[in-house]
Amino acid sequence: MNTMTLTPGQLSLSQLYDVWRHPVQLRLDASAIDGINASVACVNDIVAEGRTAYGINTGFGLLAQTRIADEDLQNLQRSLVLSHAAGVGDPLDDAMVRLIMVLKINSLARGCSGIRLSVIEALIALVNAGVYPLIPAKGSVGASGDLAPLAHLSLMLLGEGKARWQGEWLPAQTALKKAGLEPVALAAKEGLALLNGTQASTAFALRGLFEAQELFASAVVCGALTTEAVLGSRRPFDARIHAARGQQGQIDVARLFRHLLTDTSAIAESHHHCHKVQDPYSLRCQPQVMGACLTQLRQTKEVLLAEANAVSDNPLVFADAGEVISGGNFHAEPVAMAADNLALAIAEIGALSERRIALMMDKHMSQLPPFLVKNGGVNSGFMIAQVTAAALASENKALAHPHSVDSLPTSANQEDHVSMAPAAGRRLWEMVANTRGIIAVEWLAACQGIDLREGLTSSPLLEQARQTLRERVAHYTQDRFFAPDIECATALLAQGALQRLVPDFM
């Protein structure tokens, strides 16, 4: 199990990926403790001095003007968590819950939230013990923070709700007891600090980003395979073309294609002196289209990494000045817009792949047997596999509709503009699955196309890609049950089978 020392505000993308992929043992860096304690002391001073401060001794949302008596402050925080745990939908999986929890710990430990070290340590203990609260997938509009998901997370600290421990759903009290943990009582400000934040939205979008990186690499490899299968030209990847435009993503993608399409390809040599002038756009413009997608991936990375390390609580405690200030860092608009832009990239990666599949089906364009199978008529070959890819690409076009422009007012119009970031991030998962299915079909088709260039081989790296598939999926000599082959190729892609052939591009 990975051990990670968490220095608040300094999580890297690779650390976040590891948290998502694997259980982790967290340790809070000692440098965070003074700031945490100072913020708590500031909150305690406000209560002791009788000053009114939102979230400390007031109601919430439209009820912010209601002053709460000192003797009710602890009950106020507990009631807040219980009432806001109103999510619906399927429970998030352990990986997603773990990522949300670590993001929440990272934010709270920045020392601007007025939450005690003991509460943060209780969250760390849940992560380390593998106790994952039941968090329904739906119910947040991404402002004021991800209230419902984070309330379900926080229920666990109170001994309420349910959790999964060692693969079993248990009542919270039972899960805590089995893990050797105790519930906590929340003090002033702590319930609000736990609930306010963009951690669910950010985690949803991060998963989309992590999987989009794999899709991108796989699509580049399959695009290169298809280029070989249809005897496409390598000239469009010439560095001089892309330097003349100056778009960095395009320049970098062309370099990836040159890395894959080396001069040691017998296929390339076989048509070196052909008279074809230009390839279709789905081949020739791969650096331009995929380069634009890469730019979106990189921009999304920057936004999400900043948000993963942000303090998105409200109000914020500035202990050095003894002030508590209400703001709007809980508004997840940056995450929503980043997820929307990432959705465009995922849709385009799939759309371009589908066009390359269609190209291989057309004997006039590909110079291959129709639908990539001999004895056509008796055999239908890849005919319906391409239809499946088209269906998935079409679904992605609808799913790519932006969520950040869709706001509905809540809390009696006190919270009158929201981000819809959770939905923006969550739909990425379905888009990823669709695009992975498209790329799987292209991988199958491109390898079949190269097989049909009998006696000719591609570059060493692309031959590795073909061999990886052929170890699990046989060449098509005649029609057979097709769906298991798509499932197999899809699973291999999800495991990073092609991603490892591409140098780091982020």
Curated annotation (Swiss-Prot):
Subcellular location: Cytoplasm
Gene Ontology MF term list: histidine ammonia-lyase activity
Keywords: Cytoplasm, Histidine metabolism, Lyase
Pathway(s) served: Amino-acid degradation; L-histidine degradation into L-glutamate; N-formimidoyl-L-glutamate from L-histidine: step 1/3
Pfam families: Lyase_aromatic
Gene3D superfamilies registered for this protein in UniProt: Fumarase/aspartase (Central domain) (1.20.200.10), Fumarase/aspartase (N-terminal domain) (1.10.275.10)
Enzyme class per UniProt: lyase
Catalytic activity: L-histidine = trans-urocanate + NH4(+)
InterPro entries listed in its UniProt record: Aromatic_Lyase, Fumarase/histidase_N, HutH, L-Aspartase-like, Phe/His_NH3-lyase_AS
An annotated GO cellular component: cytoplasm
Gene Ontology BP term (one): L-histidine catabolic process to glutamate and formate
Family as reported in the entry's similarity comment: Belongs to the PAL/histidase family.
Descriptive protein name: Histidine ammonia-lyase
